[in-house]
Design a protein with these regions (language model features):
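Extracytoplasmic
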Residues: 13-16, 569-761
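Perimembrane helix-loop-helix junctions
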Residues: 288, 323-359
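Membrane-helix boundary/interfacial segments in multi-pass membrane proteins
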Residues: 58-67, 143-148, 249-263, 382-404, ...
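Membrane-interface alpha helices of multi-pass inner-membrane proteins
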Residues: 288-317
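Active-site lumenal/periplasmic loops and adjacent helix-entry segments of GT-C-fold
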Residues: 125-266, 286-292, 584-596
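Hydrophobic, aromatic-rich transmembrane alpha-helices
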Residues: 413-473
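Membrane-embedded, hydrophobic transmembrane alpha-helices
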Residues: 1-114, 447
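Periplasmic/ER-lumenal interhelical loops and adjacent helix-loop junctions
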Residues: 171, 177-185, 347-434
Length: 761
């Protein structure tokens, strides 16, 4: 735990860098600080994505000294825009008309004690939600240990490559991981983390980024719920429920740890909140007959939204499809409303329906065209098989990751089911079916389950609070269908629709958690509302019996605290034992799961390589046996820096992975060793990785006779590091240049690796 406290400055710096550049720009147009903070990280990732593409074209290196000033200028520009917006709103324009400036802007009225309490409670629950999400990682994992899982190894080495190459472009910035082959890969997360990492702190900084994304996630969920309902209880419940969910953030940011994909998922709620606010204002302007002016008035917020969407794509393209899957229902509903309104007019007024019909077709057709693109369909060809319809149904409505099935997990699942059912009943207005015709509570009609719509709305905006819409239920069903399809038997539809997520159910389930959180938060508010109504009724009955004034209402906060405490305690803090076990399976080298690659002693040997080998050493070893960690833990170049062997020099790669064990008898092996400058061999005993034997993938790296032609340098656990002497003198092929450009021939006059290519991981 102390090691995490030492990284607190990095955590705070990351949060400030994510929030400030975009917060004030959005705050100038949206009066809710919560929504502005929830959406600001997407704006920052949009800036980072744009800069990562622009800088290589201008030959500007990617480093803090060149990027941070731009983010700082964005924050300053946003502050100026906010100040001008506030002045114009308060003064009724920019002209002073002889009035002193201080008098023109007026004196800001301090918020009242009740509103201060509401804000404190809101941010308090966000902090609680963050702590519930982060506690397993902080209590179980050592931040200096790498995540022993397939994708995180690639991503950590990707950050390391950017530090050396000073190139964060998605169009080849990670070429070092492909042996010099330039391919497209979204680098938003890598580029951001590289701004805070040093060569020897990549692992720690990457792990801290998980905490940052957890904070972004719970804040974004609170912002999203705040714009969907005026219920204060739902707003308070959302970050707590969202922080304890097993898919996102527990699985996505610990056990599975798909950092780029998880970044995109964490950004979606905040962007969705802004999209809803902008959409409502645009719809209101159009309903008021503002016409084209409606769109002109929303240009600033629209630009922010576009940059936020760019941030989603920069983090991972699947996030854009996730946002569309979540917001497709309200988009089509609004378009349908204006289409019907236009058709109801007489004469030429009906022609106004044509643009709306076109917009509706665009919402449906354009994503289908994007799904058909070669890049996206290449992702769909990833070899991930489906399962069965029973498996599909079991994951669809309440998704769950492959965590330990503990008693606490069973209780937490049951509580989620109850909250979800309550949320569905309220969102679908099913509770109104039991009432007599004409009898309907106004607060419930607005889905203001707490009855304090004005104060709740003040947290969101000064605009009139909107009723709780039914479309989140439709979004939930859409995402549940996609999750079910991921676990369903193989089909062309599965490959086509799920390509952006590599047909991976665990990626889609994190997105489904957004809709689940909304529904469960509303369900929690409904339960509190029922208890509060019963308590108030009982209290009034007692007062009537005593002849006292019964115009009173029971306090709501004891019920909010009580129901929240029951949910947290009965679920054992969101099945924290199962979440702890999940963290340990990839972080604790003494308790590794089937994705584990390096024991505690082996990690110690890897760290000693910084002193047992020269800085220009080039290490050959099976990447899925721990050799891929030599870059981030030892600062030494690996022949295969990711768990897939996809170097540009395919011929040399094949010789090494298939025939290196014949080094004493096969002269071609030594030719490759000398040509690439391989100085050391990382030996590990054969074993299983998931359900395959490592030697089946790379047989040439096992069964090597090290009794001659090798000198033992170090050992740790079952792993050994050997210096290769079988090929005579070898010019080392590692060092800073190899990190920047990828490994290449060190022999004079040798051919350069093949030119730039594009491909998919």
């Amino acid at each position: 735990m102390l090691a995490w406290w030492m990284l607190l400055p990095t955590l705070l710096a990351m949060l400030v860098a994510l929030v400030l550049p975009g917060f004030m720009w959005l705050r100038a147009g949206v009066r809710s600080s919560l929504v502005a903070i929830g959406a600001a990280p997407a704006f920052t990732f949009g800036l980072i994505t744009a800069l990562s593409v622009l800088y290589p074209a201008l030959d500007i290196p990617w480093e803090p000294s060149t990027v941070m000033p731009v983010l700082g200028m964005s924050a300053v520009g946003g502050a100026a825009a906010w100040a001008l917006s506030y002045f114009r709103r308060v003064n009724g324009g920019f002209a002073l008309n002889g009035v002193p400036f201080r008098e023109a802007i007026g004196v800001r009225v301090p918020i009242g004690g009740r509103q201060a309490a509401i804000r404190t409670a809101t941010w308090g629950t966000i902090v609680v939600g963050f702590l519930l999400a982060a506690w397993p990682l902080m209590s179980v994992a050592d931040p200096a240990n790498p995540v022993q899982q397939w994708d995180p190894t690639f991503h950590q080495n990707g950050v390391h490559a950017i530090l050396y190459g000073k190139d964060a472009s998605p169009f080849g910035g990670l070429h070092e991981l492909y042996g010099g082959r330039r391919v497209y890969y979204p680098t938003g997360w890598h580029a951001f983390v590289a701004l805070f990492a040093r060569f020897d702190s990549v692992v720690q900084t990457a792990n801290v980024s998980s905490l940052v994304l957890m904070a972004v996630w719970v804040t974004g969920l609170a912002a999203l719920v705040s714009v969907l309902t005026g219920s204060r209880t739902a707003l308070l419940a959302a970050p707590i429920i969202g922080g304890m969910l097993p898919n996102m953030p527990a699985d996505a940011l610990t056990m599975y740890n798909q950092w780029p994909n998880s970044t995109g998922t964490a950004l979606v709620p905040g962007v969705a909140a802004v999209a809803i606010v902008v959409g409502r204002r645009l719809a209101a302007d159009l309903s008021d007959g503002c016409g084209a002016r409606s769109f002109a008035r929303r240009i600033p917020q629209g630009l922010f939204l576009l940059l936020g969407c760019l941030g989603l794509v920069g983090a991972h393209p699947s996030a854009a499809f996730s946002l569309l899957a979540f917001l497709a229902a309200p988009l089509l509903m609004v378009i349908g409303f204006f289409t019907r309104t236009s058709l109801a007019r007489e004469g030429r007024g009906q022609l106004a329906a044509l643009p709306w019909i076109g917009a509706g077709l665009a919402v449906v057709v354009l994503p289908l065209i994007a799904l058909s693109s070669p890049k996206i369909q290449a992702m769909g060809r990833y070899p991930r098989r489906g399962s069965s319809w029973s498996e599909a149904f079991s994951h669809a409505l309440l998704p769950y990751p492959p965590f330990a099935q503990t008693t606490a997990m069973a209780w937490w699942t049951l509580i989620q089911v109850l909250l979800l059912i309550a949320g569905i009943i309220v969102t679908a207005r099913l509770h109104t079916l039991m009432r007599r015709p004409g009898v309907r509570d106004a607060a419930d009609a607005r889905c203001d389950l707490d009855g304090d719509e004005d104060e709740a709305a003040a947290l969101v905006d000064n605009d009139k609070a909107a009723p709780m819409p039914a479309w989140p239920l439709v979004s939930y069903l859409i995402l549940a269908f996609l999750t079910a399809l991921a676990y369903a038997p193989d089909s062309a539809l599965r490959t086509y629709l799920l390509a952006p997520w590599y047909k991976d159910g665990r990626r889609i389930m994190g997105v489904e958690d957004i809709a689940l959180t909304v529904l469960m938060a509303v369900g929690a508010a409904a339960i509190v509302h029922l208890f509060h109504a019963a308590w108030t009724s009982s209290l009034r009955r007692i007062l009537v019996e005593r002849g006292l004034d019964d115009n009173v209402e029971a306090p709501r906060w004891p019920l909010q605290v009580g129901v929240g405490a029951i949910v947290v305690l009965m679920s054992s803090f969101g099945a924290i034992d199962a979440r702890n076990s999940a963290v340990a399976s990839v972080y604790d080298p003494t308790r590794l799961g089937k994705s584990g690659m390096a024991s505690e002693d082996e990690l110690a040997m890897l760290r000693r390589m910084a002193s047992t080998t020269d800085s220009d050493a080039l290490i050959l070893g099976d990447p899925i046996a721990g050799a891929a960690y030599v870059e981030t833990l030892a600062g030494r170049k690996a022949v295969f820096p990711q768990l897939s062997t996809v170097n540009a020099d395919g011929a040399s790669q094949k010789v090494l992975t298939q025939r290196f064990r014949d080094i004493a008898d096969d002269p071609e092996v030594c030719e490759v060793v000398r040509n690439l400058g391989i100085t050391h061999f990382y030996e590990e005993e054969d074993g299983s990785y998931y359900n395959i034997q490592r030697s089946n993938r790379h047989p040439g790296l096992y069964g090597v006779d090290t009794s001659r032609g090798f000198e033992l340098v170090d050992e740790g656990g079952t792993a050994k590091l050997w210096k290769i002497t079988a090929c005579g003198w070898v010019t080392p092929g590692g060092g800073a240049q190899a990190f920047a450009d990828g490994i290449r021939s060190v022999q004079p006059g040798a051919e350069e690796p093949e030119g730039p290519q594009s491909g998919d991981e």
